[in-house]
């Protein structure tokens, strides 16, 4: 019998559908709540060769994926795909390279460069997003130079290196 591991933090509707479809095909599912595991290469006993990474948390999912890859388990999506998808700027670069239509975008690291990038994109409005993160957190629609300066000043004061990377995207 085939066994597939499902790496998760929460079983949502999609995971329930995957589990149901696997049962119909006589595929054994091993549910692995990554929050409850000890990932140690010397002691971990793995009884599946393929895993689906379905964690809500990018950090937990990435670490679990890299662990299972290190012990020879094929993980879908693998860590290379995850590293592209977890960063909006990198994702946009890959999509553009593959000729997938995307809104114009730029990555800058200071207000002066942000102004130049926005001018090159055709002006306001734009959206500023953190390169890392999900669920629409910390994004801002910027309608003019005053809003741009205010948002970038706030990001600068927050102090986190992630807040000092400005992923700017054309508003569509």
Where are these predicted regions, by residue range?
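Short acidic active-site motifs
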Residues: 39-40, 113-117, 147
């Amino acid at each position: 019998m085939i066994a597939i591991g499902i790496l998760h933090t929460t079983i949502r509707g999609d995971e329930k559908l995957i589990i149901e479809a696997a049962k119909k095909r006589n595929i054994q599912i091993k549910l692995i709540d990554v929050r409850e595991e000890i990932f140690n290469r010397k002691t971990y006993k793995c009884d599946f060769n393929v895993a689906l990474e379905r964690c809500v948390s990018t950090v937990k999912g990435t670490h679990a994926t890299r662990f299972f890859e290190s012990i020879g388990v094929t993980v879908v999506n693998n860590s290379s795909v995850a590293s592209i998808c977890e960063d909006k700027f990198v994702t946009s670069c890959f999509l553009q390279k593959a000729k997938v239509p995307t809104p114009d975008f730029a990555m800058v690291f200071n207000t002066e460069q942000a102004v130049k990038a926005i001018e090159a994109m055709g002006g306001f409005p734009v959206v500023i997003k953190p390169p890392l993160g999900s669920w629409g957190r910390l994004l801002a629609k910027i309608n003019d130079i005053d809003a741009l300066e205010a948002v970038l000043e706030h990001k600068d004061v927050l102090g986190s290196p992630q807040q000092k990377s400005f992923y700017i995207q054309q508003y569509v």
